[in-house]
């Protein structure tokens, strides 16, 4: 069902908003509701589940923050500080922090108004008490007045649950300060709820009312299915659920079927004023493209920044974290941009640094933020005038989210994407996706900054290495495009790309297989010059030189060992050849020598046998002589001892003779 939404003032809502909420809305400068707010807030206030599809920058955050607060304010009984009434899940820490900041705008105003009302109520009640005491002494009325006087003000507490902090500290904060509204990322929120239930077996979500899944399509794209399902199982089924998304994917619809009951589908579309055609971007956004070869892209970027950075807030999107790091260094170093405010933001930076950069750029009146798609969704950076896409996003869905950082909530904005001539079919592809673009002709006679960039790299090895790493990551990221029929990898000119990056040499990588390109491509610097490039940081350069010297010594040692092995092998071969030659020259002499040697060995063996026989013969004769002497002595002794003894001696002699015979 399609209908036109009345985007009137906030006081036109059927369910009237509280004074504190209206005061905060007025203070923030929102004079009227956006289409998504006009459609969603009444449904939420009427206890309906909602499945919302709306373009980025349409005011989705207020569409769920306001109903959450109003539902708590309209409760008959006040919440305890540890009663969990609502949970808001976001895909990233940065978006969770931003939602928390918006929520605190309302909660802080609510507490200030309650403090003022308490003072006024006390005075009024005291006056009424005096008047009633003068009129009549009614005990029942006095008791009612005392109850009113003791009535507590409404306090709503919130708790931020994101990674990078200690989960035990979150539990302590919850116990001490409460958490009626939880805002967090899926993993940390699920872990927190698990520990709360584990620590208090009696804990139940008795007061729970609303669950919000912000950027639901991205939650599922990032693989948060398990923690989201775990959270859904913990929460009571009697609740209100809101799914907010820029696109309604099949996964989002499946999640809606499992986690919602008869949801109202809200789809807010935008029509172009002149063509009256539906489009996926705000009508206040001037969306453009520029056809520019990769080797000229950096020159066009510098020219663009010179004309816009002083008076505008600009976000430039790159394909990878490494390209953000490299171009952040390069743009700061170019003379014509010296002193200009540059910021960098990507997923590999520490969380504390990302928060600091985000806050600094948000508060700046002008400047340029270089980022990956980390800052493409959900983040509400105020007053962004230009979004420039130096590289096309891998996922075409990210295109709309990138340009959605400008032209938010009815403000004017501008967007520009660089495309090479080989990528021009992307324009028609986006048009089919209801994202129209108009051409912005590239500037002529722009300053060529590439020689200066090469010189910058030549003077600092760190920047040179960052450039090489950036190009490798860019090439591999380009290869993984989800629109490979538009961004065809084999049509990417690696040589011109390296020139456009201002590299001093081509990196070694499997993607570069063109041997002719490797042989012919040059930056104008020789290999010896590149090897001598030093780090500006002395400590780092000292370590590099030590490493180079160590590698050099190892190479020399390895070379010496290889040469020694070659020489030894050569010597052995020469010796073998010499032996063979010697055998050929004196074959007969060698034969005679061998025969003589054999004869000598034979004679030696025969002599040894003869000597052994002679030795045994001499030993035998000596033993026999000794026995004869013993026999003679025995004969003389037997004559003295008598015939018995003689007989025994005869027996002994017989035994000895037998032994001699045996021997």
Swiss-Prot record:
Transmembrane segments: none annotated. A motif (Q motif) lies at residues 10-38. Residues 556-663 are annotated as: Disordered. One of its GO terms (molecular function) is RNA binding. GO terms for cellular component: nucleolus. Pfam families: CTE_SPB4, DEAD, Helicase_C. GO terms for biological process: rRNA processing. It catalyses: ATP + H2O = ADP + phosphate + H(+). It is found in: Nucleus, Nucleolus. Residues 649-663 have a biased composition (Acidic residues). Keywords: ATP-binding, Coiled coil, Helicase, Hydrolase, Nucleotide-binding, Nucleus, Ribosome biogenesis, RNA-binding, rRNA processing. Residues 41-266 form the Helicase ATP-binding domain. Residues 297-457 form the Helicase C-terminal domain. Residues 583-594 have a biased composition (Low complexity). Its EC number is 3.6.4.13. Residues 531-658 form a coiled coil. A motif (DEAD box) lies at residues 214-217. The Q motif is unique to and characteristic of the DEAD box family of RNA helicases and controls ATP binding and hydrolysis. Belongs to the DEAD box helicase family. DDX55/SPB4 subfamily. Probable ATP-binding RNA helicase which may be involved in ribosome biogenesis. This is Probable ATP-dependent RNA helicase ddx55. The gene is ddx55.
């Amino acid at each position: 069902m399609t209908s036109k939404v009345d985007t009137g003032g906030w006081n036109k809502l059927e369910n009237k908003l509280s004074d504190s909420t209206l005061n905060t809305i007025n203070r923030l400068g929102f004079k009227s509701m956006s289409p998504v707010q006009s459609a969603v807030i009444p449904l939420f206030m009427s206890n309906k589940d909602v499945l919302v599809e709306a373009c980025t920058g349409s005011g989705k955050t207020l569409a769920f923050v306001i109903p959450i607060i109003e539902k708590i304010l309209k409760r008959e009984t006040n919440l305890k500080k540890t009663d969990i009434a609502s949970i808001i899940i976001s895909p990233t820490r940065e978006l969770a922090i931003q939602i928390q900041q918006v929520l605190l705008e309302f909660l802080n105003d609510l507490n200030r108004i309650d403090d003022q009302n308490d003072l006024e109520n006390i005075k009024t009640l005291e006056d009424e008490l005096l008047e009633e005491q003068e009129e009549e002494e009614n005990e029942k009325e006095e008791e009612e007045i005392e109850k009113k006087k003791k009535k507590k003000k409404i306090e709503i507490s919130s708790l931020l649950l994101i990674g990078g902090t200690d989960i035990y500290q979150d539990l302590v904060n919850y116990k001490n300060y409460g958490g009626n509204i939880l805002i967090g990322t899926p993993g940390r929120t699920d872990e927190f709820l698990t520990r709360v239930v584990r620590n208090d077996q009696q804990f139940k979500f008795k007061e729970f009312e609303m669950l919000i899944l912000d950027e639901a399509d991205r939650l599922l794209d990032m693989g948060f299915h398990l923690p989201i399902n775990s959270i859904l199982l913990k929460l009571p089924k009697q609740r209100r659920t809101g799914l907010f998304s820029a696109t309604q994917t099949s996964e989002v619809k499946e999640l809606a079927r499992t986690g919602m009951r008869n949801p109202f589908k809200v789809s807010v579309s935008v029509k172009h004023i002149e063509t009256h055609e539906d489009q996926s971007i705000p009508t206040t956004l001037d969306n453009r493209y520029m056809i520019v070869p990769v080797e000229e892209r950096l020159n066009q970027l510098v020219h663009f920044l010179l004309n816009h950075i002083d008076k505008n807030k600009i976000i430039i999107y790159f394909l990878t974290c490494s390209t953000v790091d490299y171009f952040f260094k390069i743009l700061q170093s170019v003379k014509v941009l010296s002193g200009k405010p540059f910021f960098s933001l990507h997923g590999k930076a520490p969380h504390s640094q990302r928060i600091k950069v985000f806050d600094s750029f948000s508060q700046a009146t002008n400047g340029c933020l270089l980022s990956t798609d980390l800052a493409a969704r959900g983040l509400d950076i105020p007053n962004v005038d230009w979004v420039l896409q130096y590289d096309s996003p891998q996922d075409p869905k990210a295109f709309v989210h990138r340009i959605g950082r400008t032209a938010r909530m009815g403000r004017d904005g501008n967007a520009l994407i660089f495309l090479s001539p080989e990528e021009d079919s992307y324009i028609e592809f986006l048009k089919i996706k209801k994202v129209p673009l108009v051409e912005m002709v590239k500037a002529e006679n722009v300053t060529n900054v590439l020689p200066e960039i090469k010189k910058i790299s030549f003077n600092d090895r760190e920047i040179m290495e960052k450039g090489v790493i950036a190009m490798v990551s860019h090439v591999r990221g380009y290869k993984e495009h989800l629109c490979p029929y538009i961004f065809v990898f084999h049509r990417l000119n690696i040589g011109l790309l390296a020139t456009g990056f201002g590299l001093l040499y081509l990196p070694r990588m499997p993607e570069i297989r063109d041997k002719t390109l490797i042989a012919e491509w040059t930056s104008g610097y020789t290999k010896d010059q590149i090897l001598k490039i030093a780090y500006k940081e002395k400590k780092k350069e000292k370590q590099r030189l030590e490493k180079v010297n160590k590698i050099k010594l190892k190479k020399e040692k390895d070379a010496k060992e290889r040469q020694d092995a070659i020489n030894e092998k050569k010597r052995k071969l020469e010796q073998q050849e010499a032996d063979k030659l010697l055998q050929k020259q004196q074959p007969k002499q060698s034969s005679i020598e061998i025969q003589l040697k054999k004869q000598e060995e034979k004679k030696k063996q025969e002599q040894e046998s003869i000597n052994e026989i002679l030795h045994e013969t001499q030993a035998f004769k000596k033993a026999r002589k000794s026995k004869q002497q013993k026999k003679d002595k025995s004969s003389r002794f037997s004559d003295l001892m008598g015939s018995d003894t003689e007989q025994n001696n005869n027996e002994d002699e017989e035994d000895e003779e037998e032994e001699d015979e045996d021997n």
